[in-house]
Swiss-Prot record:
Ca(2+) 1 binds at D52, D54, S56, F58, E60, E63. SMART domains: EFh (SM00054). This is Parvalbumin alpha. GO terms for molecular function: calcium ion binding. One of its GO terms (biological process) is excitatory chemical synaptic transmission. The modification N-acetylserine is found at S2. It comes from the Eukaryota. It comes from Bos taurus (Bovine).
């Protein structure tokens, strides 16, 4: 399954394009723009599993830095600052990574 099976390619393009400037990434706006906010909990979990590149059941800090690439291969990497901000927003239990339930909560709060 690919991201475009779950989200509209045009929405992905617009959302990724809105945050091309370094340190401009806003996960709440991004999740809304890309259409993730309107998706069912099942679809949000499917998106999580696409972003969990090493299939560990978590999106670790390193994977978070590449989150935009998970939506669009030619997107930029997040800066260290953006990655840390996103991790802090999503990591509810403080284990340094984001699990599927934490990701769902992060999207729901957007």
């Amino acid at each position: 399954m690919s991201m475009t099976d779950l989200l509209h390619a045009e929405d992905i393009k617009k959302a990724v394009g809105a945050f091309t400037a370094v340190d401009s990434f806003d996960h709440k706006k991004f999740f809304q723009m890309v259409g993730l906010k309107k998706k069912s909990p099942e679809d949000v979990k499917k998106v999580f599993h696409i972003l969990d590149k090493d299939k560990s059941g978590f999106i670790e800090e390193e994977e978070l830095g590449f989150i935009l690439k998970g939506f669009s291969p030619d997107a930029r990497d997040l800066s260290v600052k953006e990655t840390k901000t996103l991790l802090a927003a999503g990591d509810k239990d403080g284990d340094g990574k984001i699990g599927a339930d934490e990701f769902s909560t992060l999207v729901a709060e957007s």
